[in-house]
Amino acid sequence: MSLFEELIEGKKKDKQIVKSFETKETLSDQIFEEQKKGHFVMREDIRKKLLEISDDFVESFGVDFFIHDVVLTGSLANYNWSQYSDVDLHIIIDFEESKYEMELLKEFFDAKKNVWNEKHNIKIKGFDVEVYVQDISEDHISSGVYSILHGKWVIEPKKEEPNIDDRKILEKGEEYGKKIDKLVSIGIKKDTMTHIEGLRKKIKEFRQSGLETGGEYSYENLTFKLLRRNGYIQKLLRLKTALTDKKLSVAQ
């Protein structure tokens, strides 16, 4: 495939991804069943399987923590689910109940999450499972949160018809994509890590500002989702890993 064909194919895929942000008429019938008109509950076989997965993840901690809840959040717990959705499984823990320092706990759980997610390739009805440890006091902006532990909605989603500006999302996504491609093309140099961390911070703050002002359907959050689904976030993280590996290696 030529470079031109790759660019055309990439733009086509991006448009398909942005199209997937549109809301559906119902929640995913692979995960939920309609109990009564407009009210959905999680399928019991799915709920039990997700509890098994969360138990396996919690066992990997090697330390006892009280689990306040296990929840499904993200697009799969909402009307904007699509083929690109993940099963976002959040384990809710109160960090203040621990004797360990907050920053140490965050680093510990992030490390456990990364190792577990990389080690496993679990799918629920074709959707990838991603686990995460969430502090009970953490601000988590989501209009759909389902308690798997208790079998009920913490926040029941409402069907909305958001005004999604496809062009704006695609343009911003392309802008960030070019910046990431430029870093990759430059390769591993002395100041590359500084640029990577700077861009990661910029993207994170860009997304967070959108979540705080416009919620899940803000163009900032949807631009981030585009970058994650088209592989650009992973491309940036792979470059960071390659740089770290080179820094820690000793040449023959």
Can you annotate each of these PLM segments?
Residues K13-S85, I93-Q252:
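Catalytic core of pol beta-like nucleotidyltransferases
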Residues M1-K11, K19:
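Proteolytic processing junctions in secreted/extracellular precursors
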